[in-house]
Amino acid sequence: MYIIVVYDVSVERVNRVKKFLRQHLHWVQNSVFEGEVTLAEFERIKAGIGELIDGDEDSVVIYKLRSMPKREVMGVEKNPIEDII
């Protein structure tokens, strides 16, 4: 499955969340990560985020898709995804 993670996290926790997500997904732009994951990886990511955030203050949205969507970037692409063959 392909996931897109979008988050709005308190300044005190944002670097920990970003560092954690960089281990699993591709950084796209501020507060957005995406990537192909297995179901087990998806569950690990959800559990890891759950341990890092404060549910009363922070917000994380995870979009689950069947495969990498076609996307169109308007303006500067901050961190292009390179296709590796």
UniProtKB/Swiss-Prot annotation:
It is an enzyme of class 3 (hydrolase). It comes from Thermococcus kodakarensis (strain ATCC BAA-918 / JCM 12380 / KOD1). Its EC number is 3.1.-.-. Its cofactor is Mg(2+). Homodimer, forms a heterotetramer with a Cas1 homodimer. It comes from the Archaea. Keywords: Antiviral defense, Endonuclease, Hydrolase, Magnesium, Metal-binding, Nuclease. The keyword Transcription regulation does not apply. This is CRISPR-associated endoribonuclease Cas2. GO terms for molecular function: metal ion binding; RNA endonuclease activity. InterPro entries: CRISPR_associated_Cas2, Virulence_VapD/CRISPR_Cas2. Pfam families: CRISPR_Cas2. Mg(2+) binds at residue 8. One of its GO terms (biological process) is maintenance of CRISPR repeat elements. CRISPR (clustered regularly interspaced short palindromic repeat), is an adaptive immune system that provides protection against mobile genetic elements (viruses, transposable elements and conjugative plasmids). CRISPR clusters contain sequences complementary to antecedent mobile elements and target invading nucleic acids. CRISPR clusters are transcribed and processed into CRISPR RNA (crRNA). Functions as a ssRNA-specific endoribonuclease. Involved in the integration of spacer DNA into the CRISPR cassette. Belongs to the CRISPR-associated endoribonuclease Cas2 protein family. The keyword Magnesium applies.
